[in-house]
Amino acid sequence: MYAPIALFLSLAELLLYDPSKLPLFGLSFGITAAIAFALFYSGGFGGADSKALMCIALALPFSTEALFKPLIASGISPMSQVLFPLAIFSNAVLFAAASGIYMLFHNVVWNVRHGRKIFEGTLAAESLGKKILVLITGYKVPVAKLQAKWHVYPMEDVVNDGGNPPKRKLVVLPRDEGRSEIVGRLSSAVENGKINDYVWATPGLPMLIFVTAGLIVSLLFGDIVWLLVSFILG
């Protein structure tokens, strides 16, 4: 429902006041839609995240400086003037990256406090890439929390091969499908004393949260990535 209304209002505004921007409107939406689809099919975005980004592109294809300027005037980047949804997206990616830094710091502190290996048992044999992804997107939680919190997803699984300790593997792209089965296997392994109580999990934050934050910050302060680059380059 939101997309048709946004499209109608944007087209009406452009046709009435500035028809010359219609090609740029198509360009802005086309590039944003291409990025949204690519991220969706690669697993980086959920369906709701992709739709939200495309709806934003329909409603706010260009910078809103004509209505009100950001609190930081230099935050209006050349890209945001023509491709405002991409400025929102870049801000969202920046916030997502910041959450990864927080997760990494949290895991280092957890390791120091508990004095355990971060990757125990057969998890130590997993690839470096998988370990890095888990370190910046997940953290250790008791199995009981996995059972109680539906929005927390396991990032490791137990292969019931009869070994003691059993073989464990990292799950870098947790999904709703199979979640309860994985939690059941982890719980059983903990109850039988085959693995420690703390396992890898992720809060499963949708990218939509970061996109929303990116939208608000873009309206209030502008393109944060542009501001950072401008500051670094002097």
What annotation goes with each model-predicted range?
Residues 1-234:
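A membrane-topology feature that recognizes alpha-helical transmembrane segments
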